[in-house]
């Protein structure tokens, strides 16, 4: 039984319950795509499993290519094997990034701010492992990230990432409005080299959504002139929900983020969305977010 996706179908492997195989719909992958897969197999992240403390097992957190699969007759590359991710026991991260979506499931309904901060920290761990392999996520959207009931975060569709092999780059041509860094808008992504700073923008969006139940550009009360601009225009202007003196105000029914979160964290959001709109190099890194979240979780526990 296969699980169809946009680019291919994932099948279980007989006799290997911990592995699956992805077979592409396209019967003839171009040379660059084949080279990219070979590069990913040869340059795996240092660590792409995480200890599930409840079960005592190491579970995969990246659906990273393990081995190339070729057609028996032609010898053409047609897919790859990867570690099996338990998608039945997980939800896409957007189901946790809003209170309304969390109410749909008993286990997500009880995810308070402290637990969501823990998920955000696990997401930082995941991004760090990907960057350690010289990869850039690129298509860092709300459907490529899964969260399990044990709060472990996993990323799928890894073969769409930007991969670097020595001095050669294999680009990520995908994008998702609301998560793509503003400096990439309007670019030919098939010829654009992405940098870690573009992932830092997407990471900050996810952390904002996880902690505040709102998107920094989609939500908020628009108080500027005329119609509310599209999300990507607001992002390019550095106009985010909660910006001091900005045009996206906090909804009357919502708590001001400055009351809910420490000033140090709000300054990171300012660097990511406001100052980082014109200078991507100053966006907070994965390590900065991880340290801030670690301190926040510690303070949250002490107040429980």
Question: What residue spans do the PLM features occupy?
Answer:
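Catalytic-loop of the protein kinase fold
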Residues: 118, 127-150
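Activation of the activation-loop gatekeeper triad in protein kinase-fold domains
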Residues: 157-162
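Conserved activation segment of eukaryotic-like protein kinases, specifically the C-terminal portion
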Residues: 169-188
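Conserved structural core of kinase catalytic domains
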Residues: 60-119
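Conserved end of the kinase activation segment
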Residues: 184-197, 220
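Terminal C-lobe "cap" of eukaryotic-type protein kinase domains
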Residues: 271-301
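Conserved C-lobe activation region of Hanks-type protein kinase-like domains
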Residues: 196-198, 207-266
């Amino acid at each position: 039984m296969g699980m169809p996706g946009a680019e291919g179908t994932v099948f279980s492997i007989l006799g290997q319950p911990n592995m699956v195989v992805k077979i592409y719909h396209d019967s003839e992958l171009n040379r660059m795509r084949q080279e990219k897969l070979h590069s990913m197999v040869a340059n795996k992240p240092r660590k792409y499993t995480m200890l599930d403390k409840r079960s005592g097992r190491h579970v995969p957190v990246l659906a990273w290519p393990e081995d190339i699969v070729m057609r028996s007759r032609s010898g053409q590359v047609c897919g790859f094997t990867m570690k099996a991710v338990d998608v039945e026991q997980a939800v896409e991260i957007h189901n946790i990034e809003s209170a309304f979506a969390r109410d749909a499931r008993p286990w997500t309904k009880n995810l308070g701010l402290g637990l969501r901060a823990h998920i955000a920290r696990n997401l930082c761990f995941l991004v760090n492992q990907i960057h350690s392999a010289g990869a850039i996520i690129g298509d860092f959207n709300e459907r490529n990230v899964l969260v399990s009931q044990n709060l472990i975060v996993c990323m799928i569709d890894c073969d769409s990432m930007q991969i670097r092999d020595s001095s050669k780059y294999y680009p990520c041509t995908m994008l998702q409005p609301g998560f793509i860094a503003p400096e990439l808008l309007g670019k030919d992504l098939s010829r654009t080299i992405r940098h870690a700073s573009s992932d830092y923008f997407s990471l900050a969006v996810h952390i904002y959504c996880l902690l505040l139940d709102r998107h920094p550009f989609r939500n908020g009360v628009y108080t500027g002139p005329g119609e509310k601009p599209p999300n990507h225009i607001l992002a390019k202007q550095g106009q985010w929900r909660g910006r001091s003196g900005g045009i996206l105000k906090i909804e009357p029914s919502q708590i001001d983020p400055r009351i809910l979160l420490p000033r140090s964290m709000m300054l990171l959001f300012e660097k990511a969305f406001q100052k980082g709109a014109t200078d991507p190099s100053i966006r907070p890194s994965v390590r900065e977010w991880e340290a801030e979240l670690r301190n926040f979780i510690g303070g949250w526990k002490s107040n429980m």
